[in-house]
């Protein structure tokens, strides 16, 4: 039976470090990490995400502000707001909750955020830094950053000699995951929907990262015995056994099958998910430390 990589516990450890390092930063410099969360419209899922981010920021001792714009807000109004936040010395991290309404160009909005305040790690400058191995000065997207900490807890920081396979090539998870694994000296293959004989490629992985958004796609016989399996997927599927109309959350990996083969595995829920918000807090603290000329903490 595989070792369970407990995302809730690891996220608590990260947040605990953030709290301690925040207190040190405030004591040494008077700088309080500040995060601004911007939400446009009233999408219920976005409201839940934003509320949880704001709660966690306050728990960490941050200065946290939320800007709510109506669904009808123009792109220019949003850009003007971001420009103001870019110039606000009390704000170190800016997060625009996606998705945005259809009349707003998300790409343009994200590229307007000052790279040094881009705690989501989506600005081209941060993407480029990560792609050229400048991990120390980049902001890394929160989900792959959290997944990487989970891998490090099993294998350490140096992955020399290990084969890693990332299933999925999104800009948010797949590509940054590839770059992080490569920077840690793993030999990395990126697979996707056009990959030939995906199960055979997956079976070669000492570290298998699934980030495709297809429920339970990765079966037990895709997993190399003893491999570390990181399941980034969050999918809601019908659960008639719980009652009519009920659903449950599953990952991209068939957990029941894979758990019997893997050496270590993340559950869904309670795996990568909690790490995402924890790493957002870590990135915000890092931004504040950089602005104060202090060394960034190690998580």
UniProtKB/Swiss-Prot annotation:
Species name: Brucella canis (strain ATCC 23365 / NCTC 10854 / RM-666)
Q: Where does NADP(+) bind?
A: 168-170, 193, 234
| Functional note | Catalyzes the oxidation of 5,10-methylenetetrahydrofolate to 5,10-methenyltetrahydrofolate and then the hydrolysis of 5,10-methenyltetrahydrofolate to 10-formyltetrahydrofolate.
What GO terms in the biological process aspect are recorded for it?
L-histidine biosynthetic process; methionine biosynthetic process; purine nucleotide biosynthetic process; tetrahydrofolate interconversion
Q: In which pathway does it act?
A: One-carbon metabolism; tetrahydrofolate interconversion
Q: What is this protein called?
A: Bifunctional protein FolD
NADP recorded as keyword: yes
Subunit (UniProt): Homodimer.
